[in-house]
Regions:
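Active-site loop-to-helix "anion-binding N-cap" substructures in soluble metabolic enzymes
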Residues: 1-232, 238-305
């Protein structure tokens, strides 16, 4: 079958089965075209509970599918590709978190959503890049242990100087490879372009940005801006998506190495096979995880809304 034929079959089957397809913005364009909703982690989290359907296929990382299941416990949830993980989500385990909590006993524990559901059971609240500042500001505690991404944590800390932060030495393996020199080279090659960056990048990179925001924030800024050229400082598929949606504008990656292969493992055939009952992985979580991580995630939705 051609790509178009596979897409048509997916659209037909998901309608027949009352299935909603959610896709993270880092997925390929051909996947976004069959999705009912595309966006960043926060958008996917909210949509998971809002969608009126009997089941959800998540095209993204495992923690996204688990979050979807926790927010929609009565729906069947599948991860389109069972090996789609997130390296950052695996950087800190429960034992490591407990050691950190012992070092910072009077700190509120704020977990980036890119963490395992098990880890979330012992955190006070989780956040996404688009909601982190707002949620941390609303917390009663003045001391915050931010895990696992120190880059996002430092960005939040700069916005909230009235609070004290402690960090874990984690981070996104892709975003942290971007350097100030990469930005300088990109600006030299495209002097008229605005630089839009994700806060998972290092401070030296974020400091040079014309705009700092989540994946969705970057896309919305670029679409609405009257400017015509942009250097994109996040996963390179966003360059592809923006160029597709805004053909009258020009988009350039800040660095060629900003490609997340973990998010690229999901294919149209994965979705097709999942709908056929021949692929994917249905998400099942123990009751203690559903309950414990649920408190953390529901508080995110409450404070972030």
């Amino acid at each position: 079958m051609t790509i178009a034929e596979i897409q048509q079959e997916i659209l037909r089957m998901k309608k027949e089965q009352d299935i909603c397809i959610l896709a993270h913005a880092y997925q390929g364009q051909e996947i976004l075209e069959v999705a009912d909703y595309t966006g960043d982690s926060y958008g996917l989290s909210v949509q998971a509970s809002k969608r009126d359907c009997s089941g959800v296929i998540m095209c993204g990382a495992r923690f996204m599918a688990e979050t979807c299941k926790i927010l929609s416990p009565k729906k069947r949830v599948w991860l389109a590709n069972p090996v789609a993980g997130c390296p950052m989500a695996e950087q800190l385990d429960l034992e490591g978190l407990r050691e950190l909590k012992a070092q910072y006993p009077d700190y509120a524990v704020v977990a980036y959503i890119n963490t395992t559901s098990e880890l979330k059971t012992e955190c006070d609240v989780c956040v996404t890049s688009s909601s982190a500042v707002e949620i941390c500001k609303k917390l009663e505690q003045d001391k915050i242990l931010f895990i696992p991404d120190p880059n996002l944590g430092h960005y939040v800390a700069e916005k909230l100087p009235e609070k004290t932060f402690a960090f874990y030495k984690g981070g996104c393996p892709r975003h942290i490879v971007v350097s100030a020199k990469d930005v300088e080279k990109a600006r030299a090659a495209h002097p008229d372009a605005l630089f839009l960056v994700h806060p998972e990048c290092r401070q030296e990179v974020v400091e040079q940005a014309d705009y700092v925001g989540s994946t969705t924030g970057i896309m919305e800024f670029a679409k609405k801006s009257e400017h015509k050229e942009f250097i994109i400082g996040t996963e390179n598929s966003i360059v592809e998506h923006l160029q597709f949606e805004c053909p009258d504008k020009k988009f350039y990656p800040v660095a060629v190495q900003l490609t997340c292969m973990n998010m690229k493992v999901t294919t149209l055939m994965d979705i097709y096979n999942c709908l056929k009952g021949q692929g994917g992985e249905e998400i099942f979580l123990p009751e203690n995880i559903m309950e414990g991580a649920g408190r953390c995630i529901h508080r995110m939705v409450e404070l972030g809304g």
